[in-house]
Amino acid sequence: MSKYKLIMLRHGEGAWNKENRFCSWVDQKLNSDGLQEARNCGKQLKALNFEFDLVFTSILNRSIHTAWLILEELGQEWVPVESSWRLNERHYGALISLNREQMALNHGEEQVRLWRRSYNVTPPPIEESHPYYHEIYNDRKYKVCDVPLDQLPRSESLKDVLERLLPYWNERIAPEVLRGKTVLISAQGNSCRALLKYLEGISDEEIINITLPTGVPILLELDENLRTVGPHQFLGDQEAIQAAIKKVDDQGKVKRADK
């Protein structure tokens, strides 16, 4: 029986989402479509009468801005927002800034799918010569984390994301849910996928099939042990949501005209 409710979502669309590039830890902002997605998400949650007590985000602009816009639509701007690098997107290492379709042409669609969706596969690490290395690691936000700068990842599998996310879930988010607080998590695609895997008990093999579209709220109903009661639910127009999921899946494929 459901005892608690939790809402999570992947942030609204950013410029590099639109350009089909691996964004990861590069701090891209929402584009015009992403801004509207965030507002629509807020309207959807308002129509369902959600009242939040606490919001958790990553320390990436696109997830924070998404949360702000949702709270604005809800008229709940006063709700506390807490941000942590542990909710950041997966670190895609050397793949950061590269075009997914071009990578599929160069390395094959299955390899790109493994890099994007599998549990254990880690992309090649980012090197200091990478054009975005210094932009990431010289950013002040990473100098005030709860781990030293030199211990932050240079590349991650989804397994790595779950391992760095779980302490934050266990120590900060879960206790608030257990206190009866209504919590919103505005994060990234892979941090949300990792948390879904943990809460729903999704297998290492099955997680490759879980895709999250941008800007769509996900409802999780949890029991007293904070395990899901039934599968997660996408809130909104289901036909549009399925089309958005397909769009994300197709990002790692070669367009037919190029085959």
Swiss-Prot record:
- What GO MF annotations does this protein's record show? bisphosphoglycerate mutase activity; hydrolase activity; phosphoglycerate mutase activity
Q: Which PROSITE patterns match?
A: PG_MUTASE (PS00175)
Gene3D superfamilies referenced in this protein's UniProt entry, alphabetically: Phosphoglycerate mutase-like
Q: Which residues carry this modification: Phosphothreonine?
A: 122
The entry marks the following residues as binding substrate, namely: 10-17, 23-24, 62, 89-92, 100, 116-117, 189-190
Which PANTHER family does this one have?
PHOSPHOGLYCERATE MUTASE
Q: What is this protein called?
A: Bisphosphoglycerate mutase
Could you tell me the gene encoding this protein? BPGM
